[in-house]
Amino acid sequence: MGFGDLKSPAGLQVLNDYLADKSYIEGYVPSQADVAVFEAVSGPPPADLCHALRWYNHIKSYEKEKASLPGVKKALGKYGPANVEDTTESGATDSKDDDDIDLFGSDDEEESEEAKRLREERLAQYESKKAKKPALVAKSSILLDVKPWDDETDMAKLEECVRSIQADGLVWGSSKLVPVGYGIKKLQIQCVVEDDKVGTDMLEEQITAFEDYVQSMDVAAFNKI
């Protein structure tokens, strides 16, 4: 298993393809699996790898919480497609000072029993909350205006990037291109969200992260269902 060399374009392409139908490396919530792969990537993937870029920006937003994310961080070869081998070079093998700080949490060998216990408790609490289904789920129908930079922006690619955003409680609907003048068209796209899971701020943050295509995003209509 693996993604090839995640520091190379080929490795990032494997990661992008892997995330085409997934929100996370493993499971349905961010975990130490995402942290392990995130650490191996040199920086934000290029805009044309919209699935990988969407995932990268999402995991980056968990920077302060990464040490407490559930799961156990494993070697890169434990993640990814089964038919691809991990060849990513680890920068930690060349030099590792005693004063180095692991921003994403301790290594498994150094992790204290107390830290393990707390992490397992958090995971159990999350699973317990997830199992309790609310009697009524509040939903909203939102119409978004997504504006490109100019008339040369690839609107098909822009829409692909927008629809690549996946989240629990988010369902994309119909869309159309609407002229705004000077040959420029904006993307008007419908979505239905669960109010306690997805907000317009989150949508705006993730959509405008595709900055090579998107100039801005506005809420054109918002209706409770």
Swiss-Prot record:
<feature type="region of interest" description="Disordered">
    <location>
        <begin position="79"/>
        <end position="98"/>
    </location>
</feature>
<feature type="modified residue" description="Phosphoserine">
    <location>
        <position position="106"/>
    </location>
</feature>
<dbReference type="InterPro" id="IPR036219">
    <property type="entry name" value="eEF-1beta-like_sf"/>
</dbReference>
<protein>
    <recommendedName>
        <fullName>Elongation factor 1-beta</fullName>
    </recommendedName>
</protein>
<comment type="function">
    <text>Catalytic subunit of the guanine nucleotide exchange factor (GEF) (eEF1B subcomplex) of the eukaryotic elongation factor 1 complex (eEF1). Stimulates the exchange of GDP for GTP on elongation factor 1A (eEF1A), probably by displacing GDP from the nucleotide binding pocket in eEF1A.</text>
</comment>
<dbReference type="Pfam" id="PF00736">
    <property type="entry name" value="EF1_GNE"/>
</dbReference>
<feature type="modified residue" description="Phosphoserine">
    <location>
        <position position="95"/>
    </location>
</feature>
<dbReference type="GO" id="GO:0003746">
    <property type="term" value="F:translation elongation factor activity"/>
</dbReference>
<dbReference type="InterPro" id="IPR001326">
    <property type="entry name" value="Transl_elong_EF1B_B/D_CS"/>
</dbReference>
<dbReference type="GO" id="GO:0005829">
    <property type="term" value="C:cytosol"/>
</dbReference>
<dbReference type="GO" id="GO:0006414">
    <property type="term" value="P:translational elongation"/>
</dbReference>
<dbReference type="InterPro" id="IPR036282">
    <property type="entry name" value="Glutathione-S-Trfase_C_sf"/>
</dbReference>
<feature type="domain" description="GST C-terminal">
    <location>
        <begin position="1"/>
        <end position="90"/>
    </location>
</feature>
<comment type="similarity">
    <text>Belongs to the EF-1-beta/EF-1-delta family.</text>
</comment>
<feature type="modified residue" description="N6-acetyllysine">
    <location>
        <position position="7"/>
    </location>
</feature>
<dbReference type="InterPro" id="IPR014717">
    <property type="entry name" value="Transl_elong_EF1B/ribsomal_bS6"/>
</dbReference>
<keyword id="KW-0007">Acetylation</keyword>
<dbReference type="GO" id="GO:0005853">
    <property type="term" value="C:eukaryotic translation elongation factor 1 complex"/>
</dbReference>
<comment type="subunit">
    <text>EF-1 is composed of 4 subunits: alpha, beta (alpha subunit of the eEF1B subcomplex), delta (beta subunit of the eEF1B subcomplex), and gamma (gamma subunit of the eEF1B subcomplex). Interacts with elongation factor EEF1A1.</text>
</comment>
<keyword id="KW-1017">Isopeptide bond</keyword>
<dbReference type="InterPro" id="IPR014038">
    <property type="entry name" value="EF1B_bsu/dsu_GNE"/>
</dbReference>
<keyword id="KW-0832">Ubl conjugation</keyword>
<feature type="modified residue" description="Phosphoserine">
    <location>
        <position position="174"/>
    </location>
</feature>
<dbReference type="InterPro" id="IPR049720">
    <property type="entry name" value="EF1B_bsu/dsu"/>
</dbReference>
<feature type="modified residue" description="Phosphoserine">
    <location>
        <position position="42"/>
    </location>
</feature>
<dbReference type="GO" id="GO:0005085">
    <property type="term" value="F:guanyl-nucleotide exchange factor activity"/>
</dbReference>
<feature type="modified residue" description="Phosphothreonine">
    <location>
        <position position="93"/>
    </location>
</feature>
<feature type="cross-link" description="Glycyl lysine isopeptide (Lys-Gly) (interchain with G-Cter in SUMO2)">
    <location>
        <position position="147"/>
    </location>
</feature>
<feature type="modified residue" description="Phosphoserine">
    <location>
        <position position="8"/>
    </location>
</feature>
<feature type="modified residue" description="Phosphothreonine">
    <location>
        <position position="88"/>
    </location>
</feature>
<keyword id="KW-0597">Phosphoprotein</keyword>
<keyword id="KW-0251">Elongation factor</keyword>
<keyword id="KW-0648">Protein biosynthesis</keyword>
